[in-house]
Curated annotation (Swiss-Prot):
Lineage top rank: taxon: Eukaryota
Native source organism of the sequence: Dictyostelium discoideum
Name of the protein in its database record: HssA/B-like protein 17
Membership in a protein family: Belongs to the hssA/B family.
Coiled-coil segments on the chain, per record: none
Gene: hssl17
Organism lineage string: Eukaryota, Amoebozoa, Evosea, Eumycetozoa, Dictyostelia
Amino acid sequence: MTILASISSIGNVKSISKSNNLSSLSNSSSSLQSMNSIQCGGCGNGGLLGAVGGLVGGVLTGTGVIVGSVLHGVGSILTGGSNNCGCN
């Protein structure tokens, strides 16, 4: 009886972690869309401005996307924002 109870509780933990992963994936995809909307606009908005927008978007939408926005921000600073034509 206790073995069955422990197995069922392990199954519940796995399903909870799967649902958490799915929700974090949906949060990251929506934040990526919001980051793309921040980057939309004319060409060469300036690398620093794009980096700040990406960092703020990452912080506001969740911790899972901060790494991606930091990397994107560093890339924008290095390239000077010259490839920010339209929506990236």
